[in-house]
Amino acid sequence: KSNLAQALGIRAIQDGFTVYYIRTATLLEDIKHSRIDGTYTNLVKRFARYKLLILDDFGVSAISVDDATNLFEIIEARNQLCSTIITSQLPVKDWYGYLQNNTVADAILDRVVHSSHRVTLEGDSLRPKYGKIDENYE
């Protein structure tokens, strides 16, 4: 999933688009820090400007209700204006439980699912094949 998203991001850059790749957990941490240091509005505007935002590993790390609301703010700022790729091992049907707040989950899913192209990948991870550690590594 990550490799495919990165390949699409590279192609978008080659075609002249602005692209930003970030793990979802890192984005949520950045948002928390921006709320503390007073740069939240600028952060949301910055993420709204990229023609393609790649949110990798959605659903891997636990999030709070505040995190879900913050994620909604980013998605809302980009809604209908720019493209967003979300990679996840979590089936969409499980997003309600993951996001913990049905109102926020409804808002996010309404913006993401109804205007998306879903790609479901089957098969084993490529990491064991291409990400092998040298056998001499200690």
Enumerate the predicted regions with their spans.
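Walker B motif beta-strand of ABC-family P-loop ATPases
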Residues: 52
